[in-house]
Amino acid sequence: MAKQPTRARKRVRKQVADGVAHIHASFNNTIVTITDRQGNALAWATAGGSGFRGSRKSTPFAAQVAAERCAEMAKEYGLKNLEVMVKGPGPGRESTVRALNAAGFRITNIVDATPIPHNGCRPPKKRRV
């Protein structure tokens, strides 16, 4: 006897009005994650995953493209307001926030949550080029 074909149900996306954009801007890459208020990830994108490799990955433009891609995915959830949390010293800090603003989100506040050590690990030695 043949198996009855199971119908694939269309997944219903939950509607979220407010979210948090977590931006991790390192010297080598920028990671943008948009979550709901509870911290459940809705969408994420990276500069490396957006088609930039090598030294181009660590540019403000690559971070901007990653933020735009992440914003497109997050719009499917009906997001309107964003709180932005920025971590790290990388070059994509400012351009990512500008891209999220240009994508149509209302940015309620911006928090700089860069971890600062209380004299923890020894930093990398200075480059000699």
Swiss-Prot record:
One of its GO terms (molecular function) is rRNA binding. GO terms for cellular component: ribonucleoprotein complex; ribosome. InterPro entries: Ribosomal_uS11 (IPR001971), Ribosomal_uS11_bac-type (IPR019981), Ribosomal_uS11_CS (IPR018102), Ribosomal_uS11_sf (IPR036967). The keyword rRNA-binding applies. Keywords: Ribonucleoprotein, Ribosomal protein, RNA-binding, rRNA-binding. The keyword Glycoprotein does not apply. One of its GO terms (biological process) is translation. Part of the 30S ribosomal subunit. Interacts with proteins S7 and S18. Binds to IF-3. Located on the platform of the 30S subunit, it bridges several disparate RNA helices of the 16S rRNA. Forms part of the Shine-Dalgarno cleft in the 70S ribosome. Belongs to the universal ribosomal protein uS11 family. This is Small ribosomal subunit protein uS11. The lineage of its organism: Bacteria, Pseudomonadati, Pseudomonadota, Gammaproteobacteria, Vibrionales.
